[in-house]
Amino acid sequence: MKKSFTKQLISLILAVCFTLAFPAFSFAADSNQSDGEAKSESIYNEFKKSDGELICVSKYGDTDKFPENSAEAVAAAAEKGADIVYVSVKKTSDGYVVLMADSNLSRMCVDELGNTVNKNIGDVGYHELSSYHLRAGTGSLHEPITSCKIPTLAEAIQYLGGNAMLMIADGWEYRDEIYDILAGENALSNSIILATGDKKEISSWLASKTVMPLVISSSAKNGNAKSYVSKTLSAGCIGTLLSAKNPYNSVFKDGVQSKFKDAGRAVIDMTNSDICGGREDNPTGWNDITKRGFSVIITNDIEGFNAYRARVKSYKTSLTSDLEKAQATDTALCSTSIANKLKKTITEAKSTLSSSMSETELMEADYSLRLAMEALADRTENDNGKTVTPGRITAVVLVVIALIIFEIVFDTLRRKKVSKRRTENGRAHSSGKK
């Protein structure tokens, strides 16, 4: 009886364990999916803030490990830390939207025999296209052949799994097909379409959709940048991709950048110096471009840019902390010039915090603020933790002098009163004797 009870108890425990185990695996899968969705949603929410944090956009995915525009490169870029992956799309002869930068396949593709494919993608059907292999990295004859294939846009979205957003370029002419693919993959909220149309075209297209897609306009072929930015942002775009060969072009100046305030994001492609004013895709280039107002950076160096972004965040945190200390400082007993200098530096620090993503600007603002704080005095603290400054020392000395003067005056008056009483008492005594 005892053995039977023990067996039943063990069986019951095992049954409960198995019952709990299967839902646990199910929750784990759901949790992973939710993590991806939550990540892309977080990036989307950050992107929507015109004064938000820097955004890292990987150009064509992680090409150090996989062929550009491959599903594997896209997913690897997200794993490496990219917020968004920039991809180019083309359309096959039978209407499939696939990832490919060039109209001609010769740079990236080989057939099953290893021969370079010298065909235009618009002349090839998807069935034939899917038999080709991609060359490694950015392609060309010197790159080895890989097992990677050309993915459809839908396959790339599925492979990415919501771990980053997609920025879809070169597909504006078949935007309706792209929209339908995104809607079918439930990816309208984590994919961005790059629009090359004018305000009227963009506005009309957005208005025709029941669910608003995310769109960034591109000023490359649209004349006056200042006007284009203003008009396309008001039409519903969440940002504008700007480009110029001249480093002093208006797109890098306050007139154009001011149009993004509380309206959208300024986007720049740093992977080609000819379209970003001769600047390089490195910390020096990022610092200069973020100083000018750009906050969404298309790069080939995900890890390098993320390191730069981390330094910017660190300097912002430091400046915020020092700003709070400066604002809490009592300057009532300091000289007017020193107090005014601190006040001016505080104003400049606030402006930098609210408008700049440049590493050097944040660093310089923090340094200036610390210098202004140190200029208040050779600061020390007494046993009670009170700050002692020359102004306060002078005040204490003046108070002591006042007390001494008061004591002298009080003592003089007291002596006069005593002397007067003695005189009066002497007179009264003399009158009594008479």
Question: Where on the chain are the PLM-derived regions?
Answer:
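Short stretches within intrinsically disordered, low-complexity N-terminal or propeptide regions
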Residues: 17, 30-31, 328, 351, ...
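Beta-rich interaction/scaffold domains
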Residues: 313-393, 397-399, 403-416
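N-terminal secretory signal peptides that target proteins for export/translocation
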Residues: 1-5
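Phosphate-group recognition and catalysis centered on beta-loop-alpha active-site segments
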Residues: 11-14, 27-314
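Sec-dependent N-terminal signal peptides of Gram-positive bacterial secreted proteins and lipoproteins
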Residues: 6-27, 395-411
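Cytoplasmic C-terminal tails of single-pass
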Residues: 414-434
